[in-house]
């Protein structure tokens, strides 16, 4: 067989490991087999196209980066590939499994769909809850909880003896549950939305996997599973590798994407739109990272100790009425999680506020507490007129509950929350950072803070680039070490075989007196040993380099983390100064000068003497109602920079601004809050969309996003300048 150095095959069916040398397969996995390996099996030229006739084939699974044997009856031929792979290890004859029948169900019991398994207010299917509780009781310190290998299909889901299962069996049970669902947990439609959000990197991916994009029962189950995986990752010695490993394991289980069509070879999509085979793992990794950034505190396994003393009567000493929840300074009502994040940004541990729960169930609230530099979300439950964080619910009102934990540590509710509710974020009294009392003085100080913020941002960006580069180099070194290990293993096996054969030949040549052949055999043996020693030495040097570079990488990460609080504080101060100047009527041109932003004067409306003549006053020129992102991009296609429209957002109660920047269409969420419309706190100040549009007609969006160096200059439906003479 001559020609290419290897061949690619794609798995059509799942295959579970039967022997240590076997490969686990998922549908769509790409396998690489070297030409030398097929030659060693006696495969004639052209025989590689019929893998079912080859039998067991040795190769590399591109998804798991593992080597081993797989049945040719489970794969299809894709095409040649210019990759050199080590030859196969010798192995004895072995019967080949029959090719699964097309359309035949995977052995095992298929579970009912999720709406048939549970209903809100339950947060997840009882089977999954039972498995997760069992595995968390065994402890979350093991790094080997979840491996990428496929579990055996289950035929019994009674779980009657689950308390006797070991950790590996429980982990397989959770993976089996996901595979036993009649359809993947993440639907293809939701997967497409998540892929677009991940590709555009315009914000968190999580909202793309919430209702209505992802059906309610699937969204609840996914959220429950991510909370569990977040706890597993947070207990690992190194968070980053743990998150990547969990993504690689659960990505294919959650999406169960079918293999791409076999006509184009892998990587050969002409338009570049073919989804990456790594997308499922990357998606789960991103979701876990978002979850860990704002970790939701789960209720404890056991109910908290009862309060030391029953809360006193809520009647005031002067005979007045007890304070109501609406009057509490720390209760903010129906505000979004993003607004809460902004209010708690850069605050000390123990800072808190309460808002309405996102479930919109009457009587349920969410306490957000700052702890360890992160926001902890704690659900306030309500039943029969009583409130609490978990059973038993002993407080007569939310006010009583919060007042109790202002004096008692939350550690009695959750051991990790060893703090009290110390600093309420008051809706009546917001901190005033601006100390200067004149517009010029405030503007001068804004310039100083903005310069400090830019300097810190540049330093952080440089560190981030260095961290990304070294992380990639570390991964390449780890891959090289794995290759060294595999090469050493092959050479040592070859050495053992050679040593066994050499003894027989040496004895034979000694009897024959053939000194020349004896010397040749001994020389070959010494050369092989020398080569193995060289590879060992190279691997040792690479491991030393890896340890040194990993240490440097950790130092860069520490420096980045030390910069984050400074960046957040400087941005908060800068934003307060911008809001103060805006409220005092400072002209945007002057603000832009303080910020170092060039004032654009070339748009067609810049020279209008009377602002009342602007087409922005006519909502019909820019408000287009309920259209989606794709339709908005079509309307703005080919338009000049600054052309914009306002539409309804897919987020309930919000709007979206689509604007052309550097020839591309960008999308920004417009929030509607109690204080007004705006792109972000503390800028939600505008009483209507029209007021917002008129302000940003001359104010750059760059203050919200460094990539949006544009104003809302040209309403999409406004009459524009005439075409050039050549086009008339």
From Swiss-Prot:
GO cellular component, one term: cytosol
Domain SH3: 4-80
CDD domains named in the record: iSH2_PIK3R2 (cd12926), SH2_cSH2_p85_like (cd09930), SH2_nSH2_p85_like (cd09942), SH3_PI3K_p85beta (cd11909)
Region (Disordered): 81-117, 254-279, 295-320
Domain Rho-GAP: 109-295
Outcome of substituting residue 376 to E: In MPPH1; uncertain significance
Residue numbers bearing the Phosphotyrosine modification: 464, 605, 655
GO BP annotations, alphabetical order: B cell differentiation; cellular response to insulin stimulus; immune response; insulin receptor signaling pathway; intracellular glucose homeostasis; negative regulation of MAPK cascade; phosphatidylinositol 3-kinase/protein kinase B signal transduction; positive regulation of cell adhesion
Biased composition, class Pro residues, residue ranges: 87-98, 257-268
Domain (SH2) ranges: 330-425, 622-716
Disease link: Megalencephaly-polymicrogyria-polydactyly-hydrocephalus syndrome 1: A syndrome characterized by megalencephaly, hydrocephalus, and polymicrogyria; polydactyly may also be seen. There is considerable phenotypic similarity between this disorder and the megalencephaly-capillary malformation syndrome.
UniProt comment concerning the protein's domains: The SH2 2 domain is required for interaction with FBXL2 and PTPN13.
The protein's name in its UniProt record: Phosphatidylinositol 3-kinase regulatory subunit beta
Organism field: Homo sapiens
Source taxonomy: Eukaryota, Metazoa, Chordata, Craniata, Vertebrata
Gene: PIK3R2
């Amino acid at each position: 067989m001559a020609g290419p150095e290897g061949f690619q095959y794609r798995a059509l069916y799942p295959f579970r490991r039967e022997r240590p040398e076997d490969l686990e397969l998922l549908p769509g996995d790409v396998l690489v087999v070297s030409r030398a390996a097929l030659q060693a099996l006696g495969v004639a030229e052209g025989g590689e196209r019929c893998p079912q006739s080859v039998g067991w084939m040795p190769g590399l699974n591109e998804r798991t980066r593992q080597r081993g044997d797989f049945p040719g009856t489970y794969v299809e031929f894709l095409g040649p590939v210019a990759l050199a792979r080590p030859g196969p290890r010798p192995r004895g004859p072995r019967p080949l499994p029959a090719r699964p029948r097309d359309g035949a169900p995977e052995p095992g019991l298929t579970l009912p769909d999720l709406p048939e398994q549970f209903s809100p207010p339950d947060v997840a299917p009882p089977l999954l809850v039972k498995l997760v509780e069992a595995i968390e009781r065994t402890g979350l310190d093991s790094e080997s909880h979840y491996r990428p290998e496929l579990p055996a299909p289950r035929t019994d889901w009674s779980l009657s003896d689950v308390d006797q299962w070991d950790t590996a069996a429980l982990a397989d049970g959770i993976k089996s549950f996901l595979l036993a669902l009649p359809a993947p947990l993440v639907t293809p439609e939701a997967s497409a939305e998540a892929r677009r959000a991940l590709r555009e990197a315009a914000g968190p991916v999580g909202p793309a996997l919430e209702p209505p994009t992802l059906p309610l029962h699937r969204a609840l189950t996914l959220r429950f599973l991510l909370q569990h995986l977040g706890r597993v990752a947070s207990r690992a010695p190194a968070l980053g590798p743990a998150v990547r490993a969990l993504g690689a394991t659960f990505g294919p289980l959650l999406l169960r994407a079918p293999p791409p069509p076999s006509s184009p070879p892998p990587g050969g999509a002409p338009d570049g739109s073919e989804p990456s085979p790594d997308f499922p793992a990357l998606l789960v990794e991103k979701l876990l990272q978002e979850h860990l950034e704002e970790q939701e505190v789960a209720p404890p396994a056991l109910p908290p100790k009862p309060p030391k003393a029953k809360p006193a009567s809520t009647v005031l000493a002067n005979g007045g009425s007890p304070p109501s929840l609406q009057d509490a300074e720390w209760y903010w009502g129906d505000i979004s999680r993003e607004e809460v994040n902004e209010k708690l940004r850069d605050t000390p541990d123990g800072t808190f506020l309460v808002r309405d729960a996102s479930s919109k169930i009457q009587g349920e609230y969410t306490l957000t507490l700052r702890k360890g530099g992160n926001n902890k979300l704690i659900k306030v439950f309500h039943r029969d007129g009583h409130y609490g964080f978990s059973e038993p619910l002993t407080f007569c009102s939310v006010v009583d509950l919060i007042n109790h934990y202002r004096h008692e540590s939350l550690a009695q509710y959750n051991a990790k929350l060893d703090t009290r509710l110390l600093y309420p974020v008051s809706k009546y009294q917001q901190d005033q950072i601006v100390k200067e009392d004149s517009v010029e003085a405030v503007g001068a100080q804004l310039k100083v803070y903005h310069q400090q913020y830019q300097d810190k941002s540049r330093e952080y960006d440089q560190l981030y680039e260095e961290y990304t580069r070294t992380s990639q180099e570390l991964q390449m070194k780890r891959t090289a070490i794995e290759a060294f290990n595999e090469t050493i293993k092959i050479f040592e096996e070859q050495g053992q075989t050679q040593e066994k054969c050499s003894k027989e030949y040496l004895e034979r040549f000694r009897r024959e007196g053939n000194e020349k052949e004896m010397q040749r055999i001994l020389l070959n043996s010494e050369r092989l040993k020398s080569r193995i020693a060289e590879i060992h030495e190279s691997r040792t040097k690479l491991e030393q380099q890896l340890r040194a570079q990993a240490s440097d990488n950790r130092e860069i990460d520490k420096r980045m983390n030390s910069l984050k609080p400074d960046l957040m504080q400087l941005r908060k101060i800068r934003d307060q100064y911008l809001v103060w100047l805006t409220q005092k009527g400072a002209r945007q041109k002057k603000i832009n000068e303080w910020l170092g932003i060039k004032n654009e004067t070339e748009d067609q409306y810049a020279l209008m003497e009377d602002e009342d003549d602007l087409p922005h006053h006519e909502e019909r020129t820019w408000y287009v109602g309920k259209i989606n992102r794709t339709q908005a991009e079509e309307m703005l296609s080919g338009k000049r920079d600054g052309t914009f429209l306002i539409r309804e957002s897919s987020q309930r109660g919000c709007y979206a601004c689509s604007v052309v920047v550097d020839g591309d269409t960008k999308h920004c969420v417009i929030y509607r809050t109690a204080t007004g419309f705006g792109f972000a706190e503390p800028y939600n100040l505008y009483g209507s969309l029209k007021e917002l549009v008129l302000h940003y007609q001359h104010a750059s969006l760059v203050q919200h996003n460094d990539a949006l160096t544009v104003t809302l200059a040209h309403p999409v439906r406004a009459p524009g300048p005439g075409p050039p003479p050549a086009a008339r």
